[in-house]
Structures are given as C-alpha cells and as structure tokens.
Amino acid sequence: MKMKLETLNSSGLPEPNDKDLVKSNCVSRFIKQQIDKAGARISFRDFMQHALYEEGLGYYSSKANIIGVNGDFITAPEYGEIYANSLAKQCAIITSEIKGATILEFGAGTGALAVGILKKLKEMRCLPEHYFIIEISKNLIDHQKRKLKQEVPELASIVSWISSVPEEFTGIVIANEVADAFSFERFVRTSNEVLQVCVAKDKEKFRYDLIPANNKLCDYVVFLEKIIGHKLDHGYLSEVSFEAQDWVKEVACKIKSGVFLILDYGIPRSEYYAPNRNQGWTRCHFMHHAHNEPLIYPGIQDITTWVDFSILSEIASDNGMKIDGFLNQSQFIINSGIEENFQNFDKLDLKAQIELSRQIKLLTLPDQMGENFKCLGLSKNFNLNTNLFKSRDRAYVL
C-alpha cells in the first residue's frame, strides 16, 4: 500500500481578513506556477521558501504585522527588558575584554532586542563601536530603524545593517529565534526506504506527494539512525534543516574570536527523533494560533520547526568552536543575574510590580517559555569567563 500524508483543514483557526486572503491567494497562484514549471511537484523545502521568503510576495517580505499583539506570534524580547538585559550582560563581557569587539544580531524582528541590549550596555558603560543587524525582511528593517530612532536616538548611529557575517569577525553573534525559521525538508521513513515530502496541487488546493528521497536526504536519515542506535519506525514523519546547518558552519568559519549564542525552541537529537515524536516538529503560527498544517494560508502564516541542537553544536565544533554550554531559557535568565531585577522591587508601584512578575513568569516557567526555549553557547579563541553556564549546564545531552 502506497504511503500517504493527509492535509489537515483550517477548522479552529481564525478567518483571515479580506486583505490577507487576497495576499494568500496571490502566493498560492505563484507556488502553483512553480509546481507547473517543475512538472508535477516541488519539495516541501521549496514550498516553504516561496511561502515565507519569495521577494515581494512571501510572508516575511510583505506581511505588515508579523510579531507582536497584532501579529502571529510574540518573541521573548517583546515581553520586556529582562530578556535583553540577560543578553546584554554577556555582550558586556565580550566588549570589555576584546578590543574592537562588535555585536551582530541575526533576524532582529521588531528591533526590541537591539533597543534593550543597547540601553543596558549604555547603563553599564560597555557600548560597542558597532551593532550589526542581518535582516532579510525590508519591512522589518524599516520597523527596526523607526524603533531605534524613537527609543534610543542617541545610539542609532551605532547600528548598521549588513548582508552577511564579516570575515574574521570579532565579537558576539546573537541569533534569537533564527534557526527555527530556515527552510527545511520533511521526510517519511518506511520499512524499506526514505520518502521525501513534496507538495503538488489538486484542483484548487495543495496536497502532499511522497517520492523516494534524494541521496542527501536519504544519507542523512541513515546517519541519524546510526547515531540514535535504531531504525525509525514505519511511517515516521520528521524534518531536517540543511540550511540551518549551513548557516552555523558559515558563522563558525567567519568568527575569528568571540561568542555565538543560538537561542530558540528546540531539543537534543535523542528527543527530536524519539519514537513517540513520529509526526515531527513542524509548527505554524497564524494570529496567535499554533497548528501543524503548513499548506493552508500560504504567505500569511509562519512556518517553523523545532531545532535539533545536537547537529548544530556538532557542526560548530567541527568548524573550530568550543561548546561552552546548553541551558533552558529559565536557567539562562537565572544564571544571568535575575535577582538584579528585584533590587528596587519595593520601590515600584503596584502596576510595575505586577508587570515585572508577569515577565519573569512568562520567560521562566516551564509551561510558558522557560523549558522549551534553549540557549546554546559557543566560543572561539575566547574564554567565556562567566557564570552563565556554571549552574545546570546540560551540554552533556547534545
């Protein structure tokens, strides 16, 4: 019997407004044209690339509201200054100990993290000469520039936007919720072969089409099975992001001296490809509703997958970086000196006390962001002399 992968419907999700629906229909037509050009199907990776990143059309290049209350999801920096302060303290170590060290942030979103880090570094008198941002969305770049000019006009001149990591980079690279956004392949394991998940069209809708995997994907699944010590079960569905792997390799190779922090929702390989995770880790976000079907509402919903931190740490290590530690977000914030946020707690008014408590709960509680989000710390030619990874480091699970 031929293996099939069914498409889920949109029941339970909010209805898009007329403007977003028109946009999604335009994206759908474009992707269908690409399917026609390819013959019968395109890889899931290509579908995702078109839906999210196609210039002038995809989700990240044309949707007005992505992050925040009026968008589809909220990231940790949007909740307040605690998260940014935690990262700023790590930045301060690098900028104070390495002459000419700079800060580079991948995918700066609304600019909230950059603003928060710069405010804290100014307070600590540890401002860098340069704060670089690599951002693929022109809409988000415009948003970031406005936010910086509004909230830290005296520091806006420090910030500049670049297209790639400079050669022989010295400083700290921060990637907050970046690794999960790279386009990825999906695969299905059967008893005798590996199938690649592709996307075809069926009248007006998209559908999945499974074909024998190419050598690269097939070899990777065989590699996985060798590492985890058993063959994946028949019908096992999962993902792999070769683009995220290539990205880590590029960054690692270009860092001459400094630190690379990858912060995202993810887990080690042993959990990622566990037997009970046979439906994979693909997640979509639409108007603050999370679901598992990427083929609906193309161009107006986010598509992500959880991060396999094991493979990213191995690639970084293979390219000259040291693994300093691996923490959940809760421990990252605690180890960064969470108590400082409560030094003047009694002097705050009731509203400010409630807001501070809310931030702490959202960022640290296991049922919020505290457990699922992780921090992988990497360094090269630099001793990260900090307490960040001294308590409850879980690098041994990678």
Regions found by a protein language model. Give the residues of each.
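A short SAM/SAH-binding and catalytic strip from SAM-dependent methyltransferases
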Residues: 165-191, 237-242, 246, 250-261
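Short helix/loop capping segments that flank catalytic or ligand/cofactor-binding pockets
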Residues: 60, 181-184, 271, 385-387
